[in-house]
Amino acid sequence: MHYGAATHIQNSRSHGLETVPGHQRLERGAGGETPEFPGCHSPAPPENFGNELLPLSAPLQGLSEGLYPPGRNKTLPAGVLREGAVQFLHRGLCNSNLSSEASARPSGTQDELHSSRRKTGQTRREGARKHLVCSFRLYPFTVHTVSPGNSHLALYQVFKAVKLCPSETSFFLSRKSLKSSDPWHPPSLSPNSWNRQAGFRAWSSHLISLSLTCSDSQSRRVSSSQQPPLHSLSSHRRAAHVPE
């Protein structure tokens, strides 16, 4: 045996690194990707699933990248996407709320406190908008997979799942604050006669009004009393988007 090889084997044994018989060594590819272990396979998605659906938004796209390795273009199965999206949304909103609550108790002058409250309000409004966008993206998958033919039931299931986030529970459960825009009675959509352009235009208008309502509620809660509320502006916009 060659002297160098014998020395390498001896050093490996002394450090407890002796190779086990039958062990396959994993090496990184040219792109830095680690190959999958034998026997580990992702569940195969349905053949026609996702053909009529919109592409994922940024938060859900990040979720899909976490489920599958880079460089693999796979359609997520319905159950995986629905459960994963709710968990991802819940985790993201909770992290946002923790950072907001931490910044809501600073020590400093009155001006610093006022500035911190403004930043907290902006953070919560941004979180509310992302919340609604995720709900909007989750709805088409739910209406096609959970309750086809019943858009109202699908919407109820989406909001029921999304309201897991504690800070937004009051918004999704309070029908008084929604006034002319009620999430429990959205624009009528039927998958049997699905018109994507008209349907999503109606839903865009519906969610814009919801987003403005949520923004008004959060801004009134955290903003200073000297700042004029945005309620009048959102009321005009809601009236423009809601059919009479």
UniProtKB/Swiss-Prot annotation:
Q: In which tissues is it expressed?
A: Expressed in neurons of the paraventricular nucleus, thalamus and occipital cortex and in glial cells (at protein level). Predominantly expressed in dendritic cells. Detected in brain and skeletal muscle. Highly expressed in mature dendritic cells and at a lower level in immature dendritic cells. Expressed in paraventricular nucleus, supraoptic nucleus and nucleus basalis of Meynert. Strongly expressed in paraventricular nucleus of depressed patients compared to controls. Not expressed in monocytes and B-cells.
GO molecular function per UniProt: DNA binding
Locations listed in the record: Nucleus; Cytoplasm
* Polar residues: bias regions: 99-110
Query: In which residue ranges is the amino acid composition biased (Low complexity)?
Result: 219-233
Query: Which processes are annotated in GO (biological process)?
Result: auditory behavior; cochlea development; cochlea morphogenesis; craniofacial suture morphogenesis; genitalia development; genitalia morphogenesis; hard palate morphogenesis; inner ear development
Keywords of the record: Activator, Cytoplasm, DNA-binding, Nucleus, Transcription, Transcription regulation
Detail the disulphide connectivity of this chain as listed in its UniProt entry.
Answer: none
Provide the protein name: Dendritic cell nuclear protein 1
Query: Lineage of the source organism?
Result: Eukaryota, Metazoa, Chordata, Craniata, Vertebrata
